[in-house]
A protein has these predicted regions:
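PRPP-associated nucleotide enzymes
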Residues: 1-214
Length: 219
């Protein structure tokens, strides 16, 4: 029997892919969606009739959600299409203060607490119908409040526990302030991705004078 390698092992999708863009992440999700549509369109189409690959190739993977707000500033999450059995990825930037909403006639910038509350609203609106939910949070909510040094709240630990209790399967973040905060959810999946190489590569591309070996060594 021939040995199986990474080249000939096929992975069956968990479910139809769905991408949810939270406020402030629309442009990023558009780029991700366009890349996935193009990449999957170029894949072999031999499994198109296989029920396990249902929804593998689509025109878009974005899921239409809305977060209407009342005049009091209160909001609700609405999922405008079925996500039953989907493999959902929710992308949120909780530190994006360029997002605003109207409260009592005033434009108010969204705080990390507002972004986090919206995230929970969308998860609640999904109502447990998705096959798997993954949260992609580039900067971890309350990541700097990762330990207690006096009579303090453990906000990051509480947030992680809340998300897991709401049915989130995976939480992904970049360069967490202290990755040991994952101890708050020992049975949950917490991925701390280090973007060091990508940052150096981006700097070298954007600032050509940094490409010289001697210059890089002096950084």
């Amino acid at each position: 029997m021939p040995r199986k390698t990474a080249e000939n092992v096929e992975t069956i999708p968990v479910g139809p892919l769905g991408i949810i863009a939270m406020p402030g992440c629309e442009a990023l999700c558009d780029k991700i969606d366009k890349y996935l549509v193009k990449w999957r369109a170029n894949q072999a189409s031999e499994h198109q009739q296989n029920i396990a690959f249902y929804g593998y190739q689509r025109d878009t993977y974005k899921v239409n959600v809305s977060l209407p707000r009342f005049g009091s500033g209160e909001a609700k999450g609405v999922v405008n299409e079925s996500v039953r059995g989907f493999d959902l990825y929710i992308i949120t930037d909780v530190f994006n203060y360029s997002c605003t909403y109207n409260m009592y006639g005033m434009e108010v910038p969204m705080s990390p607490d507002d972004h986090y509350a919206d995230l929970k609203r969308v998860i609640s609106a999904i109502s447990g119908k998705a096959k798997r939910i993954t949260i992609l949070m580039p900067m971890l909510y309350e990541g700097r409040q990762h330990k207690r040094s006096s009579r303090e709240s453990l906000d990051c630990a509480l947030a992680l526990q809340e998300l897991v209790n709401l049915g989130v399967d995976n939480i992904m973040t970049f360069d967490a302030h202290d990755k040991r905060v994952q101890n708050a959810i020992p049975n949950g999946s917490f991925e701390n991705i280090m973007p060091t190489y990508q940052m150096i590569k981006s700097l070298a591309v954007s600032y050509t004078h940094l490409r010289a070996h001697e210059t890089l060594m002096n950084l």
